[in-house]
Amino acid sequence: MKITKTLTAMAVALAATTGTSAVALDELVVGYFMEWPTANQYAQHNKLYDEALGIPVKWVSFDAGTAMSAAMASGDVHISYSQGVTPFLVATAAGQDLQVIDIAETYSDNNNCVVRSSLEIDADNTDELKGKQVALPIGTAAHSDFLAQIGHFGLAESDFKIVDMTPVDSAAAFASGEFDMVCGWGGPLRRMKEHGNVLLSGPAKEAVSG
């Protein structure tokens, strides 16, 4: 498995600007995605991290990795768990002092874009997507995935009307009939699929966007 793919799966970013270690803190604050099932949640639920570190660990849920970056920049969060490579790269490119401290496996089928079923658009007629309105969280892994998929089908970002929206909000909007296409991950992605279909999945998607 390529490192680029595993980084896309889970980028843990450390707010190095705090200049402190965990043992010097009264409390460690960790950002995470509530609807993103990961093995660490067992230890989180059973407070095993608190026990190992000797201090309370406060877990704060976020809807997107970009929000995690903002929280770390303000000092409100010390570590972002499963932030995603795209938000990390965007933040560090802008000068934010973050450090990747661990990586995990790829999650190709748990991050995708969904087209409204009534449009009857699939991988064979993607030209019909031109001019459609898409809701996605800009600057995240879902955004990168969207760009990779439309590029594979010969489309450009300028072919769409894009609205910056978190997966949680876009899944709700999609269910109420808004938007032609939405992109997201985890629990919101499952809800999106109740009203639409993906263009690529499995090995085909892995080959295009990882």
Label each residue range with its predicted role:
Residues 73-83, 94-98, 132-133, 175-184, ...:
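Alpha-to-beta junction loops
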Residues 117-133:
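Flexible hinge/capping segments at coil-to-helix
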Residues 42-56, 143-161, 193-195:
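Ligand-binding cleft/hinge of the Venus flytrap
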Residues 162-163, 169-210:
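Pocket-lining segment of extracytoplasmic ligand-binding domains
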Residues 59-70, 83-85, 155-176, 187:
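Short helix-initiation/N-cap motifs at beta->coil->alpha
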Residues 34-61, 67, 90-93, 150:
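Short, polar/charged alpha-helical segment
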Residues 33-36, 63-65, 79-89, 94, ...:
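Beta->alpha turn/N-cap motifs
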Residues 24-37, 55-61, 131-135, 161-163:
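Short, well-ordered beta-strand elements
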